[in-house]
Amino acid sequence: MFPMKDHSALEQHTLSRDELRRRKGYKKGLQLSILLLGEKGSGKSTFLNNLCGQDISLSDGDYDDDDDKVTNNVTPENGNAIEDIDPGYKTAHLSPGLKLVTRRVYLNDELGVPITLDIILFPGCGDNVDNSQSSVVIKNYLDQQFANVLKEEVRIKRNTKETDGRPHVCLYFLKSTPRGVKKFDIELMKTICDKVNLIPIIPKADGLTETELNLHKDIVRQEISQNNIRVFDFKSDTLGETLALYDMDIDSSSAKSKYDNDTKIKEISPFAIVCSKTFNKNSENRVEHIRTYEWGSLVVEDQNTSDFIYLKAILLGSHLQELKDVTNNVLYENYRAKVLTEKKNNYDIPNYSYIDETSRGSVSNVSTRRNSASRTLGNPDTNDENAYQIHKEIDEKNRIIEDYQRKIDLLEKMLAAPHQNKV
């Protein structure tokens, strides 16, 4: 008798590196950082509650996208916080300013894999009379997250526990208007599209007829193409592949069905979604969010009435790792190459000014500035001992980087050279 083969060991040996990494990631849990942009009233907070299946408490004195109440915001007129002002005509003349709100949410998806969602919002984005500085602040925030990672990489003693604050995807909520996409939204998307994976969203799609919705999607696609806005590339991925992870299929035989399993994801973008604060559990004990009208009701998770379920499957399932890989291997590497190239004529990695959660100053007063150490290093002849030590440490780091670069260049030459030793 021949000994029985250990098929589990054989399977482990033949698994691809990506598959092994995926299985290991499932055991440790997954993490995704989501940036949500769009003007007030576009339904961002309700979308997050539907996506996470829970109330993530964005309205506890900081932010409520679906509420008219203004709390703890900053006005350009006086730079002071406004506390609990009643909605209506009393606040109609006030600009809300711009601030940063972050939340961390822990959830288990349908596959039973623990997922950590880091949520980033900029309340006031697009809501001010003068929005000219909003794009600068948001761009600087994204650049600063890249800079933080780069600073950690060039440290001699690296802090492996340093939090990575880079957003992996930006969901941009574009409210439908008769004139198409607003100029501010176009300019902001152009500004940030090379710093974060951009996915355009059409919220509150139930307010449009099917003809109006298709027209608005065409307008958004046209504006994105004409303005060379880079959006996340789904390549030839299909909706059927996306839903397969959720053990779901597209019922193309249904009269209501708009798509089939072979429909490419990029063909339905921008995603038209409907969300609701009302929910219940269906016969399979799954949470369903219900939107009620005079003529009936609509299930948010129904694939025939909204693109929400496809977007959820993309973010929490099929494309979660790809969004992170593109962020790290493409967007960050482009930033890193640019900064290190410029660094030959500079002493330090730049700092970028943006409004953090503790800053309540007016956006119009924000300007890019370097920190005190950078200003000191700008004068090589300074007698300041601290500046000398910092200067010396940076020179040491530069030498290490140059040594690594020489080794890389040497390896590339060796790989490119013909194998002359072969007979």
Swiss-Prot record:
Keywords: Cell cycle, Cell division, Coiled coil, GTP-binding, Membrane, Nucleotide-binding. CDD domains: CDC_Septin. It is a peripheral membrane protein. The keyword Membrane applies. Residues 121-124 are annotated as: G3 motif. Residues 203-206 are annotated as: G4 motif. The keyword Nuclease does not apply. Pfam families: Septin (PF00735). GTP binds at residues 38-45, 124, 204-212, 291. Residues 28-342 form the Septin-type G domain. It is found in: Membrane; Bud neck. Residues 384-417 form a coiled coil. GO terms for biological process: actomyosin contractile ring assembly; ascospore formation; cellular bud neck septin ring organization; cytoskeleton-dependent cytokinesis; division septum assembly; protein localization to bud neck. GO terms for cellular component: ascospore wall; cell division site; cellular bud neck; cytosol; meiotic spindle; microtubule cytoskeleton; prospore membrane; septin complex. Residues 38-45 are annotated as: G1 motif. GO terms for molecular function: GTP binding; GTPase activity; molecular adaptor activity; structural molecule activity. Residues 360-385 are annotated as: Disordered. Residues 360-381 have a biased composition (Polar residues). Interacts with itself. Interacts with CDC11 and SPR3; probably to form a ring at the bud neck. Septins are GTPases involved in cytokinesis that assemble into filaments and form a ring at the cleavage site. May act by recruiting MYO1 and HOF1, a protein involved in septation, to the site of cleavage. Septins are also involved in cell morphogenesis, bud site selection, chitin deposition, cell cycle regulation, cell compartmentalization and spore wall formation. Belongs to the TRAFAC class TrmE-Era-EngA-EngB-Septin-like GTPase superfamily. Septin GTPase family. PANTHER family: SEPTIN. This is Sporulation-regulated protein 28. It comes from Saccharomyces cerevisiae (strain ATCC 204508 / S288c). The lineage of its organism: Eukaryota, Fungi, Dikarya, Ascomycota, Saccharomycotina.
